[in-house]
Amino acid sequence: MPVDARTPNEKTVAPLAAASAFVESLRKPTHILVAISGGSDSTGLLLALQEAKAADDDGLRLSAVTVDHALRPESADEARKVAMLCAELGIPHTTRRWDGPKPASGLSEASRLARYRLIADVAREIGADLVVSGHTIGDQRETVAMRAARSGGSDNLGLSGMADAVLYDAHLWIMRPFLACERQVIRDYVSSRSRHWLDDPSNENIRYERVRVRQTLPHSPIALDDSTAVRRQMLSERTAVFLRERAQVFHAALARLADDDVNPDLPEFRHGLAALIAALGGRSYFPAASSMERVLRFLKTGETGRMTVGRVLLDRRRDGLYIFREQRNLPELQIESSGQAVWDDRFLVKNGSDFPINVAAGRVGTAAQAAALFPSAPSGVVKPAMAGLPQIAAAAEGWVSTPEVAITPRLAPFDLFLPRFDLELANAIANLFGRPAYPQPPV
C-alpha cells in the first residue's frame, strides 16, 4: 500500500515534467539505457522518457535492460513481461540473468553489485552513453532515515542522501531523473497511460532494513533538505582546492601535509584527510566518525607521534603529517600471463608478460632509491612507505622489473561508485595519485 511521508517543505515534480527536464538537460546525441525491473517506478520512468522523447527527438535513443536476479521462481516470467512491454513500445530490450551461487549472507549488497555489473555490461555492448534508474523521493527518504539511524550528527555526509547521478566503475554515469517524484504520482501516471506494473513481494519483506524503515516513515517522517546536498558538494569542492594546493602524494603510497596546513578545526582539512586515509588504505568508505574524532584529538595536541586508522599510519613530525599504508596484512597474489588483478585494493596490476607473476609487498631499497622515490621524506617514513608498494616477481624466478607489467593506482573510495557530489574531490585525489580525471556527467 503506498504511503505518503511528505513533510511540508519538500518539493516534488510530476513524472513527465521530470523526464522532460532531464531529456532537455542532456548533451546530444545520446543513447539512454533505462534500467527497468517492471515495478511502478521504473515502468513510469520508461514511459515518461518515451513520451519526452516524442516531444524532443533530436539525437535521443532509448534502450532498456532488465536484470533477473533469479532469486524467486517468478522472476523469469516477470522479465519476459517487461520485454513484451518494451516490444509494444518499440524500445530495444535486453534481459540479463544473475547466474551462479548466491551468498548466504549479505544478499542485498551482492544483488546490488551484480545488478550494476550486468547493467554496465549491457551498456557497453550496445554503446549506451548513460543509464537511468527509477529511484524516487520515497527511496531518498528511506536512505536518509537509514543513514540518520547510524549517525544522526549534523556532520554526517550521508544525510545528503543519494546523488542525482553516480559514476559506476569510473566510466558509466547512472542518473536518477525521478528523485523528486512521489511513487503514488508515478503510479497514477502509469495507470493514466493504460499500463500496469509488477509488484515485487520482497518489497514487503521485513527482513530487509529498507522495508522496515519504509513502514515506519508514515509515523516518523524524514524531512529532506536540499541544502544538505548543496553543503556536501560545496565542502567537496573546497576540499578539492585545499588538496590541490596543500597536499603532496608520492607514488600513490605516501602523502604529506606541511605542518602549517595541519588544522583540525578546518572542515576542508578534516574532509581531505579522511579522503587521503581511505585512498591510501584501500578502503571504499571514509573512516567512521568515531575514528576521525580520535585522529583529530591526536592532531590537536600538536605533539609528534604515530597512530593508525583505516589501515594507514599517521606519522606527525615537526615538519608535517605523513600518511602511508601500515605494514600489516599486505597480500600476496599470482597473476597469470595476460591477466590482471587488484592488489591490496590500492593498485591494479596488469600482466602483459608471457609468464605468471607474483605480486607482494615491496622490499626496502637502497638509500638512493628511497631518496628518488620519496624526496625530502624522513628515513623513518620512507622505509615503511616503500614496503607498502607492490613488487613484481616472475613466479618461477626472483624479483624482476618488466615494462610488460603495468601498475596503476586504484582509488577505492571513488572507483566503483562516485556520487556527483564528490566529483571534484575525486578528481583532486586522482591528480595527486597520477590518475586521469574522472569523466564529467553527460549534461
Curated annotation (Swiss-Prot):
Question: What's in the GO CC field?
Answer: cytoplasm
- State the Gene Ontology BP annotations: tRNA modification
The record's annotation in PANTHER family points to: TRNA(ILE)-LYSIDINE SYNTHASE-RELATED
Per the similarity annotation, which family is this? Belongs to the tRNA(Ile)-lysidine synthase family.
- State the reactions this protein catalyses: cytidine(34) in tRNA(Ile2) + L-lysine + ATP = lysidine(34) in tRNA(Ile2) + AMP + diphosphate + H(+)
- Main subcellular localisation: cytoplasm
User: Which class of enzymes does this protein belong to?
Assistant: ligase
In UniProt terms, what function does this protein have? Ligates lysine onto the cytidine present at position 34 of the AUA codon-specific tRNA(Ile) that contains the anticodon CAU, in an ATP-dependent manner. Cytidine is converted to lysidine, thus changing the amino acid specificity of the tRNA from methionine to isoleucine.
User: Where does the chain bind ATP?
Assistant: 37-42
Does the keyword Zinc feature in the UniProt annotation?
Answer: no
| Gene3D superfamilies referenced in this protein's UniProt entry, alphabetically | HUPs
Any one Gene Ontology MF annotation carried by this entry is: tRNA(Ile)-lysidine synthase activity
For this protein's source organism, the top of the classification is:
Bacteria, Pseudomonadati, Pseudomonadota, Alphaproteobacteria, Hyphomicrobiales
Q: Which gene encodes it?
A: tilS
* Compartments in which it is found: Cytoplasm
Comment text on domains: The N-terminal region contains the highly conserved SGGXDS motif, predicted to be a P-loop motif involved in ATP binding.
Q: Name one Pfam family in it.
A: ATP_bind_3
Q: What is its EC number?
A: 6.3.4.19
Signal peptide residue numbers: none
The protein's matches in InterPro entries, at most eight in alphabetical order, are given as: Rossmann-like_a/b/a_fold, TilS/TtcA_N, tRNA_Ile_lys_synt, tRNA_Ile_lys_synt_N
Question: Sorted alphabetically, which keywords does the UniProt record give?
Answer: ATP-binding, Cytoplasm, Ligase, Nucleotide-binding, tRNA processing
Write down what this protein is called: tRNA(Ile)-lysidine synthase
Name the species this protein comes from.
Agrobacterium fabrum (strain C58 / ATCC 33970)
